[in-house]
Amino acid sequence: HWGLYAIPARGEWVRSVEEIKKEDYMRYFQEFDPVDYEPQKWARAAKEAGMKYMVLTSKHHDGFCLFDSQYTDFKSTNTKCGRDLVREFLEAGRAEGLKVGLYFSLLDWYHDDYPHFGDRNHPMRFNPEYPNEGRNFDNYLTYMHNQVRELCTNYGKLDILWFDFSYEDKYNVMRGEKWRATELVNMVRALQPEVIIDNRLEVSGEGFGSLWTGDPAPFHGDFVSPEQIIPPNGIQDKNGRDMVWEACVT
């Protein structure tokens, strides 16, 4: 996890937790200049520690892209550093013989067409000055899918794609086909046929989704992703069979 939120240094959820308005958060965009970002050192240290792969947050929930997306101006190449930080990360990992992957947020608190007021997580969820009338979620989905296509097309082979995350609130069920998930996964599989995908197009870190049922949805992913816990006895599906999992501890 790394992005604009490294500047206030209060976690990647700082904009939501502190209900920071977009215009106030933009000061971090103006300041962002990671002069000490040296992914080659990260990759070398990871390899020496015995790690097999690395995954970077290409875009977290704040919507800031660490890659040069043609669909937004809110990206690292438009900051003082002018660098495509994702490309540097992937090249560094591959140079050390590591598998490389990218995290990509399904949520986007920067995009005007993502739900604001009443959403479970948006920084403006309690602010009636940000109603959802006039917001076109289909526009957002097209934007989001286009960015995933960029990552799957312009950055070489990806070994892991880590989507994050699905949820429900009183107004919406933000999971599965709400994300046009089958279409998204089919695109990813066509562009990156060997990639493995997590299960968060249908759940968060609190559930296992249809992989657990033995009757998986088309967008179920390849592994489950328990968060903030390492299951002491692994994870079994409803029929008692061991499941593939990766713990997400941040």
Give the location of each predicted region.
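Mature catalytic domains of secreted/periplasmic carbohydrate-active enzymes
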Residues: H1-T250
